Regions:
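N-terminal active-site segment of His-dependent metallophosphoesterases
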Residues: 1-68, 356, 360-374
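His/Asp/Glu-rich metal-coordinating catalytic cores
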Residues: 23, 48, 57-227, 232
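Amphipathic, non-transmembrane alpha-helical secondary structure
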Residues: 31-42, 67-70, 140-144, 265-272
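Conserved residues at the C-terminal ends of beta-strands
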Residues: 52, 191, 289
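Accessory, non-catalytic peripheral segments of nucleic-acid enzymes
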Residues: 238-374
């Protein structure tokens, strides 16, 4: 039985400016998450720790963070740590990956395919790493093929599986599922896409490759539990994968309807009903929407203060007042003319995108009108 821990897309020292004064605290969270992963590597006595890229930012990465990684990897020796650099941490001459000395149990993959043999485990690990931030060709096009005489074959890669779940990341190092099948390895440890996803071998009907997702949420799009993958590969080639939660905090993104709210207290009571089960240590992003009483305009500072118990609480107000727009447009007033103009723009829109922009503009106009009413 062969076992491994697979992670990717840690993004240490990433420039997450939206965190403002919480930035260094979140960087500490990411380091503690890596320590949690290290503890799993040791406690589960795995054979390998596989890291599929975007570990430490090339731009903005700090030497102190690189030293932290060096010490962390040394603490799991002699367990091999196999790293395939990604587009955010390419294998460049001036990167910490090359300018620092690393423990002997750290195995780097470069833009030239690497092949590391572990005869005592009857295993070969193949890998390829970015040499620059932008790669538009499939690295598998130059894969040299498997070595004979070994029972287990693993691969570590950072890139995009074409036709995978849509993601906002650039399709760097694009690969097809068929290329992975043709490589004929037992498992491909992938990185680049921050949303967890597994790919099943079309013939063998077992996991062939996977993205574990980022182990600590980086933006408000990376919500919920964040995990690493624990893999076990038996002598017959049967692979099982287990997702293990490791994040220090969770990110929550909610849309809360303020329908009918006439006071701050009514709105807060409705919000508490939805936010009450979220841990104080977590990050919460709320969008308020829906029609509210025209005489009530939510105060963002008040709401931020009321929910300051959360590690981070950010709120956006997209509500609109319960104003009779048709009645206003019939009046000869500035407000009525404004709404009539927006209604005309919406009616003449040439695409759904233009119509949506007009609708949002109308909501903004109604919000401003409501704010002036008594």
């Amino acid at each position: 039985m062969l076992s491994f821990i697979h992670t990717a897309d840690v993004h240490l020292d990433a420039p997450l400016h939206m965190l403002a004064d919480r930035y260094e605290l979140r960087q500490d969270d990411v380091r503690r998450t890596l320590q949690t992963i290290r503890d799993l590597v040791v406690s589960r006595q795995v054979d390998f720790w596989l890291i599929a890229g975007d570990l430490l930012e090339y731009h903005g990465g700090r030497r102190a963070t690189a030293v932290f990684l060096r010490d962390l990897f040394e603490s799991v020796a002699p367990i091999p740590v196999c790293i395939a650099p990604g587009n955010h941490d390419p294998w460049r001459a001036d990167s910490f990956y090359q300018t620092m000395d690393w423990p002997g149990n750290v195995y780097w993959f470069t833009p030239e395919w690497g092949v590391y043999e572990f005869p005592e485990k009857s295993c070969v690990i193949y890998g390829w790493g970015f040499g620059q931030p932008h790669v538009y060709e499939s690295p598998l096009a130059t894969f040299p093929g498997k070595l004979e005489g070994y029972r287990h074959h693993l691969m570590v890669l950072h890139g995009t599986i074409l036709n995978a779940t849509k993601d906002e990341h650039q399709p760097y190092a694009p690969m097809s599922l068929q290329e992975l099948v043709q490589a004929d390895v037992d498992y491909v440890a992938l990185g680049h896409i921050h949303k967890p996803e597994q790919f099943v071998h079309p013939l063998k009907k077992r996991p062939l490759a996977a993205y574990p997702g980022s182990p600590e949420g980086l933006t408000n799009k990376e919500t919920g539990e964040r995990c690493v993958l624990h893999g076990e590969l038996d002598d017959a080639g049967k692979l099982t994968l287990q997702a293990i939660p490791v994040s220090q905090r969770q990110i929550h993104k909610l849309t809360i309807h303020a329908q009918g709210a006439e006071t701050a207290e009514q709105l807060i009571a409705g919000m508490e009903a939805q936010l009450g089960r979220i841990a104080d240590r977590d990050l919460v992003y709320v969008t308020l929407t829906g029609e509210r009483a025209a005489h009530f305009v939510p105060s963002i500072p008040v709401l931020e203060q009321r929910f300051s118990r959360f590690f981070l609480f950010a709120i956006t107000d997209e509500t609109w007042p319960d104003i009779d727009a048709q009645k206003l447009m019939a009046e000869d007033s500035i407000w009525g003319k404004w709404l009539a103009k927006l209604a005309q723009i919406e009616a003449n829109a040439r695409s759904e995108e233009e119509r949506e922009i007009a609708r949002l503009a109308k909501q903004e106009a109604l919000a401003r009108i409501g704010g002036s009413m008594r």
